[in-house]
Amino acid sequence: MKGLLARMHQQWQNLFPSAPSKGQHFEQLAERWLQARGLQPVTRNYRCRGGEIDLIMRQGETLVFVEVRYRSQTSHGGAAASVTRCKQHKIVLAARHYFKQHAINEASQACRFDVIAFEGDQPDWIQNAF
């Protein structure tokens, strides 16, 4: 009976993945997609008290802080529109925390903030999004 319940639970999870696993899936897709375009991964899911950064990548000498968003429907403005000013502020605070924790001079390190927006399977890469 336990085996049957475990299999049913696994099938249920495959049909209806949780939001975190769906988010992780699209973060992995975004990371591979960016790597195919020449960016190098630095870290994934950087967290601090003020916020979180999904991906930190490097493109040449530039650190790229990437927010990954997925929306199955665009009825509420779509994936890119879901990166609100409040969310942008939290990402910037997390980036500043990253600089401090890694002894990086914020004034001399080139950086930018990108958004990878998924609506379906195709990513929309918005460079210098904010």
Swiss-Prot record:
Belongs to the UPF0102 family. This is UPF0102 protein AHA_3896. It holds the Pfam family UPF0102. GO terms for molecular function: nucleic acid binding. Disulfide bonds: none annotated. InterPro entries: Restrct_endonuc-II-like (IPR011335), tRNA_endonuc-like_dom_sf (IPR011856), UPF0102_YraN-like (IPR003509).
